[in-house]
């Protein structure tokens, strides 16, 4: 495994999740049986291009009333599915490898990208504790991850992430802007025409 430094408190752990790829995909399949992917609506009324769902005690949601974490899936009215053990172990291990010990996530946002799907530059500000890092796991098709500064207008580094790569950012880099360029077409032997991203956070 290779560590690639991005900024103070931020790095890419190349291929860190690759050995658990099949188990992670099985976990995602189990989660989506109970909480299928959906395209959420932003407060401005726009439909997000990325399909989303959640697992764990808290789930990130957006609708016309705003962005927030909720213990209940607004589609089913039921609690989000439990976070699979393999998810939690991976997130905790990645955090420790990046120097963030005793990290225990309580939210996992599962994003499914189709060709053309993107995520515009944004900060993660809905969490209660900014001392806890963000863990981002890439599965499936490669993508270009944007890692910017502390203003939306700051120049963003373009970082290619492939199946099994994990990006960790926290500490002085916790509130940096980040996003994903539109996904290019392709086919991955395990994930097909999609890229799936797991984003772990300590939200509550």
Report each predicted region and the residues it spans.
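Non-heme Fe(II) oxygenase metal-center motifs and adjacent flexible, charged/small-residue loops
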Residues: 1-204
